[in-house]
Amino acid sequence: MGKLKHTVCYLCGAMDRVADGGVTWRRTITPKLKKLGVGVLDPCDKPTECAVEDDDFRNNIENAKKEKNFRFIKESMREVAAVDLRMIDIAHFVVMYMDVSVHLCGSYHEAFTAIQQKKPLLVVCEQGVENMPNWMFGVMPLEHMFS
């Protein structure tokens, strides 16, 4: 317990292609981390007023896609990416929830940013370690992969 106390963790995982917006697993793990004295940076509950990804935000993005208003999407997502990547900068380590049946884009970017910054990346794969993308085996320790 002592080694994790006063550290900060970022919770990395899909948000825009999952029914619950990525909230459920984060709500499950957050109290466990806090009990260990770990601060949590959750992109579903950002510590800022900007770049909030709630139902209204997702609906606005989907409507913009239908209307081919790609400029709106770019401006909106640029802010989201900036805030989320800044949280990676601040975090001491990252916990990533990976469901290989869901297309990940931002999550992989966040994960590889953490790896480049030499921060521990702990990956929990819904389908088991044996189903993780091959690339992950080449860029992170086996000891950081979990089923």
Language-model features, listed with the residues they occupy:
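Conserved catalytic or regulatory cores that recognize and/or transform ribose-phosphate-containing ligands
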Residues: M1-S147
